[in-house]
Curated annotation (Swiss-Prot):
E.C. number: 2.2.1.2
List of catalytic residues: 131
Cellular localization per UniProt: Cytoplasm
Family matches, as PANTHER family: TRANSALDOLASE, TRANSALDOLASE A
Protein's name in the database: Transaldolase
Protein family according to the UniProt entry: Belongs to the transaldolase family. Type 1 subfamily.
GO biological process, one term: pentose-phosphate shunt
Gene designation per UniProt: tal
Pathway listed: Carbohydrate degradation; pentose phosphate pathway; D-glyceraldehyde 3-phosphate and beta-D-fructose 6-phosphate from D-ribose 5-phosphate and D-xylulose 5-phosphate (non-oxidative stage): step 2/3
Length: 316
């Protein structure tokens, strides 16, 4: 048995791609996208029909020029998501514009718009996860959206404070970023590349997993942003793991035996009192890595959203 097949016995495998061929090949349960992956898909010649459909939709809907560009961007996000859903049995994660990450109200409105676009084409909201950056504002947005049966994937999660706030707000799923945490420590010369046992990205997910399971939180943990298969295998047993096609291929080609490393405890303890907003902000800001990587992630996803809109601005 190859390692990918073996890993599927311990964790639900999710494809971190918008590439249909890769999704068909590796047969994941779910798939995740982000602004960078959507931009990559739009830039591919094979997806120009989706671009044309989005432009036609935006023009037909009308309105101000800037609104048409935004409508085209939202439309292609959903159309690519629908195409992926044809190939998987589970969820597609579609991301809200990162520039809205500090507005609860704006994030809620955009999430509802995305869900409406899916439902207009016959896709139930119970197959879509709305991706939001794990800011306080978006965590609160996810809490409200869940009341309308809109489930969210809180992404760009780097600090334990973010993880706690998500669990305490009963959000559906979090995506702690293993690789980006690892990258920061490497860039600061604080870590040897060869010593996985002290990989802070892996340690972070293990800590979150143990905490969630100890206190019986229902929020799903989906390890994300991997740099090598060793990070993935170290987290075997994590609820979900979202993996790029390059690493899925490597797992499929390896046959070395793997064991389950993460498993829930046999008993559950009473959880602590939830963090207040002030406590959350203080705790999160004690972690220099998390502060930098969250802001970098929001900023870079925002840049890719602008690049996507620039493509449509030339077509509308």
């Amino acid at each position: 048995m190859n390692q990918l097949s073996a890993l599927k016995q311990f964790s639900i495998i999710v494809a971190d791609t918008s590439d249909i061929k890769s999704i068909c090949k590796y047969q994941p349960e779910d798939a995740t996208t982000n602004p960078s992956l959507i931009l990559q898909a739009v830039s591919s010649n094979t997806n120009q029909n989706f671009v044309d459909q989005a432009v036609q939709y935006a023009k037909k809907k009308g309105g101000l020029y800037k609104d048409q560009i935004i409508n085209a961007s939202d439309k292609i996000l959903v159309d690519l998501g629908i195409e992926i859903l044809k190939k998987i049995p589970g969820y597609i994660s579609s991301e809200v514009d990162a520039r809205l990450s500090f507005s609860t109200e704006a994030s809620i409105l955009k999430a509802k718009k995305i869900i409406d676009l899916y439902e207009e084409q016959g896709i139930s909201r119970n197959r879509v996860l709305i991706k939001l950056a794990a800011t306080w504002e978006c965590i609160k947005a996810a809490e409200e959206l869940k009341k309308d049966s809109i489930l969210c994937n809180l992404t760009l999660l780097f600090s334990f404070a973010q993880a706690r706030a998500c669990a305490e707000s009963n959000v559906f799923l979090i995506s702690p970023f293993v690789g980006r945490i690892y990258d920061w420590y490497i860039s600061q010369n604080l870590l040897s590349k060869s010593f996985l046992g002290k990989d802070p990205g892996v340690i972070s997910v293990c800590k979150i997993y143990e905490y969630y399971k100890k206190y019986g939180y229902k929020t799903i943990i989906m390890g994300a942003s991997f740099r090598n298969i060793q990070q993935i295998l170290y987290l075997s047993g994590c609820d979900r793991l979202t993996i790029s096609p390059v690493l899925l291929k490597e797992l499929e080609s390896n046959t070395a035996k793997i064991d389950r490393n993460l498993a829930p405890p046999s008993f559950i303890s009473v959880p602590p009192v939830a963090l207040s907003e002030e406590e959350f902000r203080w705790e999160h800001n004690q972690d220099a890595m998390a502060v930098q990587k969250l802001s970098d992630g929001i900023r870079n996803f925002g840049k890719d959203q602008l690049r996507l809109e620039k493509i449509f601005s030339k077509k509308i």
